[in-house]
């Protein structure tokens, strides 16, 4: 059995342009669906966060409208409650990449607050690229790629084809106008070849060992692509 590392946010808010702290965390579907896919394939999951903080859940991600109705909302809430690893994270600072067969970053707006500027996560991402370790990143989690700054000042993901939560989706979600910055814009700024799909539809982009997904609906397909790469 191989171990797969989930790097998750420790932030329970996203600071908007006016200083307002918008409540957030990780998005349930983006953790639950890949967790189920990886464990069904026989892999062990280890969760890591900055400082070993228990990852806060974006409570909005349990709303019926995001889970196909009341039944779907209850199903994902029950599934999330059964994932004990989320309640017992290790410190990201103590992680040894060599211990893991793959690395996965679930989204939610939380990573826009902490992982986007976390140097430890940034180094882990650089090392994952260099070692060929399968790396999956979905929705807002590509914000973490912004911290992957190389010694020469460039970003390790410059030139990579990838995706992440789009400006169109952020606008439809109602937060684009109040955000300090938008993920799609920043990914383009670091030199990534951003691939935009239709809002809310699955969109997965694979470039070398990097697998990215645009939105919550892409989480399952990202996990499936990663499993093809995990030995």
What function would you assign to each model-found segment?
Residues 135-136:
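Conserved, well-structured core segments that form or line functional sites
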Residues 1-131, 144-231:
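Extended, subdomain-level signal for the structured scaffold at the beginning of enzyme domains
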Residues 140-142:
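Conserved active-site segments centered on acidic
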């Amino acid at each position: 059995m191989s171990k797969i590392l989930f790097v998750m946010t420790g932030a329970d808010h996203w600071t908007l342009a006016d200083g307002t702290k918008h409540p957030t965390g990780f998005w349930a579907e983006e953790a639950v669906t890949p967790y189920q896919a990886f464990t069904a394939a026989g892999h062990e999951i280890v969760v890591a966060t900055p400082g070993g903080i228990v990852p806060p859940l974006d409570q909005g991600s349990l709303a019926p409208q995001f889970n196909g109705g009341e039944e779907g909302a209850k199903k994902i809430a029950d599934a999330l409650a059964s994932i004990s690893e989320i309640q017992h994270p290790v410190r990201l600072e103590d992680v040894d990449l060599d211990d893991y067969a793959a690395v996965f970053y679930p989204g939610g707006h939380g990573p826009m607050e902490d992982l986007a500027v976390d140097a430890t996560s940034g180094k882990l991402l650089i090392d994952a690229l260099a070692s060929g370790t399968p790396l999956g990143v979905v929705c807002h989690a590509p914000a973490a790629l912004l911290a992957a700054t190389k010694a020469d000042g460039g970003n390790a993901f410059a030139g990579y084809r990838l995706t992440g939560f789009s400006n169109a989706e952020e606008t439809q979600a109602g937060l684009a106008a109040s955000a300090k910055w938008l993920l799609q814009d920043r990914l383009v700024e670091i030199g990534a070849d951003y691939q935009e799909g239709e809002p809310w539809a699955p969109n997965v982009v694979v470039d070398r060992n990097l697998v990215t997904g645009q939105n919550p609906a892409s989480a399952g397909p990202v996990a499936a692509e990663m499993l093809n790469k995990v030995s």
